[in-house]
């Protein structure tokens, strides 16, 4: 393991924990801890929503799909971009307005209970149970991804890597609450976008350019250049339907609730969609031209 890599990872992890400690002293009440006191700017709102949404999938899952399936995998990107835009356009601002005016609801279950005047609290309980159940699995997958990264990078045992990663994430989350989570996601979003811009450019340069890359792919497997190859109309609809998930993902919706003013939502939407489009295009390019790179290097 090269020393610069170790130093970089250590500095990153220390920064995450430091953010948690900083916001520990900036947190005054439950609203601050759960929703950041509704004081987030449009930039942090947008990038934290994007980073928490895409997470490791943008760096591993989507490139992997493009690598194995070819350009047909871009259908899922279209669905995600359209779904995210509609979510920002139709859900974000009304949700910010309603949650603030309906007894200052600071969670999704609170909002539903207040919005529909549920005096039995049944709606609040059911919503909370659903979120707890499914997001336990969702969060677990993120922790597993982090452990796999530590395992490969630092040659740690998987169980040790899982414990280290979990302790770091849980530490800054419990120390700084929502503000810490949002600001760490903001930093991660910047790093993700930079990596997904630089990496495909390096790969394309290494293989001799876009045209050369396309020729390498065409000679190895022409079907990877066919946007409908190996799928069907139902298959394409299924890929496009991924974008429907945006309308019900609590970790994205709470970002809309926490922006400091609803009038800043349009700016946040512009920042968020710009980040998403650039990052997804970079992710697609990594997987697609990564296939050409592997062939050109003779890697098995």
Where are these regions (language model features)?
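Hydrophobic alpha-helical segments and their helix-loop junctions in multi-pass secondary transporters
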Residues: 19-26, 92, 139-147, 151-164, ...
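Membrane-interface "cap" regions at the ends of multi-pass membrane proteins
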Residues: 1-60, 173-176, 189, 195-201, ...
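Residue-level recognition of transmembrane alpha-helices
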Residues: 9, 49, 77-80, 162-166, ...
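Interfacial loop-to-helix junctions that mark the boundaries of transmembrane helices
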Residues: 1-8, 68-79, 150-160, 221-240
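Residue-level recognition of pore/gate-forming positions within transmembrane alpha-helices
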Residues: 13-16, 52-53, 80-84, 131-132, ...
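Membrane-interface helix-loop-helix modules in multi-pass membrane proteins
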Residues: 35-104, 234-245, 252-258, 262-297
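Helix-loop-helix module between adjacent transmembrane segments
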Residues: 75-173, 241-245, 279, 287, ...
